[in-house]
Every structure is written in structure tokens, then in C-alpha cells.
């Protein structure tokens, strides 16, 4: 059932040290229409946005939503947590017919409840394409909100953060890469071992030739700080770069950017500076570039409380500058013990500045997911907290 709900629109103006940016709350969730939005927003050519919330709705198992260009919301589907799945994670993708595809971390197979791959038609009918069994075919987990699908020749490719080969961090399984057809047939393309090739695969990207690229988050038990990999059209996996940890970053997360020269840009959740961090021993994270020869350059090291820590989404490239958000850091107050998070910009040469520091009030707190841009260079993102207590979608004009 589709429900159209009014938007709460709040505008806040602030002045940064170098220039004035405009920040406004595009939509504030109220639990009935969703709670804790996560993952990247998808924008269509008409200016509508699509996304998911992990919680909220009538069953508190999350929803799929649409926001129009003015921020008015339509609930497209409410998950029950049963065989239809629940607690959706990551971004949705949309095909040319207007169907949406995504992943849930709960529900599906009643003996496991390990999540699903779903298709939501334009008319609002949800079809479960695959229910994970939790063994060799993989399993999803709500602690991994950064996952998503890519479509190549009409077939869906994605990561399962757990399952597959056992032996990684509490025997959760090291994760798999899979393919699901429109008819619902799943094929496991690769099972990670947690050793030199890494474990816990993250969000994926593809190139025009159909090759798949991504990162593994690393395994504490295996002593692996994460990798970048390529899966070619024959199913062969090649490790392109292995993170050494420390100052170079630990646990690359979220979707990568890859330019025409084969240079990857991304973020690590940990590593880098270990002072003034919410998880001090792990580090506050870095922004990195890895060239086609496998050489890494650290563009920015997070660490100062006011500057943000623990990147909470991938990078958005706008005219050679990279925009992103951090989960912690920024403004520390009674709402946010480790800081409410920030939106930042970093240039290709490493110049860094903060565009907005969340306060934990009506402007939101704890941003999650990558930013999405429009034709006017406005940026849109989500926070899992703040607003009415259920998170917000925000708009910022750099």
C-alpha cells in the first residue's frame, strides 16, 4: 500500500570559515514513515529520491520510500520481517521500467532469517528473488548497512557480508559474491577465505566490460586489514591492493569510485590517526587513492574531533572534489558523546574542510551512506538519528 505523507521542511543557514553553505532538512522521519534511513539515496531523472530505512513502519522492520523534489514522502513498501524480509540495508537500484531492487538483512528463509534479495515493482508488489540460507550461499547482517546491488546485462550482482567459508571473526563466515537472475536463481561467484584475499565484502561497482570491483573489510582473526579486488567476467577474483593497516587505513568500506585511468578512491573506517577517536586503538579512518599499479596515497587522515572521524559512506566526485560524511566527530554534546558527525569535502590534492557539523537536534545526527548530487550541485544524504528522533534526509549546497 502506498501512503503519501507531508514533509517537515526546516532550513538552517550557517557560515563556514571560507564560504557560506546552505543546509536544510529535506525530510524528517516520524517512525510511522520509517526510522534510521541508511544507504545511499537514488535519484531519478525527474528529481525523485528512493531509499530505505532499517526500522520503523507498522512492523518496525523498515520501509522502502520515495521522496519527491520537494521532500514529500511516499511509502512504497513496509517490510514485515517474515518471508518478505526485514531491516533493509544499503542502497536500492532502479531499472529502466521503474522496478527497485535491494537487500534485506533479516527474514526470508524461516529456518535462518538471513535476509533476502528483493524486487519491488512500480505498482508496489514485492517479489523475493532469493532468500539466503546462511551457509555456502551467504548471509546478510544489519551491522553491514553499506551493501548494495549492481546490474550487469539484467542480472544482479552483490555481496553477502557473511556466510560462505567459516573461520572469520566468530565463525560468521567470510562472505561471498553472488549473482541472482530475474527468475531468482542464485549463483555463488566467489567465497572469501579471510586470508590474503580478505573477508566481508563491501558494496560493488562495475565497468562497461562487465567486470566487478569492490573491497573487503578485513578480518581481525586473520590479521587482514582489507583489500581491493576485481572479479572478471569469467569469475576469476584478483586482489588489486592489500591494505597494510596503520597509517594507510584499516577496513575499507562502502562503494568505491574508479576513474578512467583505473584509480580507485575510497575511505577506510579505521586506521590512520589513533588519537581522539571513538575507538581509539583502531584509528579514525582515512580517505585514500589507489592507482592502477597498486600504489596507495592517503589524501586525508581523520582524527581531530571537530574534523570528523569514522567515514560513514563512500565518496561523491563533483568536478574533481570528493564529498563525504563521518559518523562521529564534529559537535560533541549531550546528544552525541563522540560527536554527531560531519559533512566534508576533500580535494584530489588532499585539501580538507568541513561543510556541516551536525548537532543532534532537528538537523540530524550520525550520518549514514554516501551523498547523492543533483544537476544544481546540491548534495543529499541521510542521518540515522536526530530530527524527530528517527533520522532525516538533508540537503546541503556547498
Where are these regions (language model features)?
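Extracellular beta-propeller repeat domains
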Residues: 2-398
